[in-house]
Amino acid sequence: MSTPHWFDQGSLVLASNNKGKVAEFEKLFEQLKLPVEIIPQGRLNIPDAIEDGLSFIENAIIKARHASKISGKPAMADDSGICVPVLGGAPGIYSARYAGEHGDDAANNAKLLNDLLPFRKNGEAIEGMFVCVLALVTHAEDPLPQIFQGIWHGEILEAPRGENGFGYDPLFWLPELQVSSAELSKEDKNKISHRGQAMQLFRESLQK
């Protein structure tokens, strides 16, 4: 296993102020046992970037560059959300502010359920997928950001289930396990989730 040169800087900024994401990432990075300190951007008083991209990849890169520019350190950003094909992929990149106010999970869930009412027919399942894109930049103007993408397929429930997780987890049903994402432990979720998948690709990149 070769050592990435950004390891030499001794730290990596995690470009997120979302407490739920930060908690999941801290657990995932703990499992990786990287020889670098992982610093959530909030500890450096880095404000959220303006996410004006049109895709998960664009927004992840924007956030990573923003954190790296302010901190002067390598940075990793996550852009993620839930996509529902019958809604044309919505909420998509607007998942965190689907109902208008950023980070209002209850309102976002309620809006998604309401928007899906016209599509509920004869108990048919409505497909959904969680998407996570990780972008790693070694410096703010890195011309070759590393991109890692995970997609987690499931269905959208008619009512919330479970108390764990955050965001749309209570509405995300895993038919093969017969549980919602919010009924999984953090450890079990990280093994199979969109974010866990993307982190696994990141882990594999470190072994090349």
Swiss-Prot record:
Signal peptide: none
MF annotations from Gene Ontology: dITP diphosphatase activity; ITP diphosphatase activity; metal ion binding; nucleotide binding; ribonucleoside triphosphate phosphatase activity; XTP diphosphatase activity
Cofactor: Mg(2+)
Keywords attached to this entry: Hydrolase, Magnesium, Metal-binding, Nucleotide metabolism, Nucleotide-binding
One GO cellular component term: cytosol
Cofactor: how and how many bound: Binds 1 Mg(2+) ion per subunit.
Residues where Mg(2+) binds: 79
Annotated catalytic residues: 79
Name of the protein in question: dITP/XTP pyrophosphatase
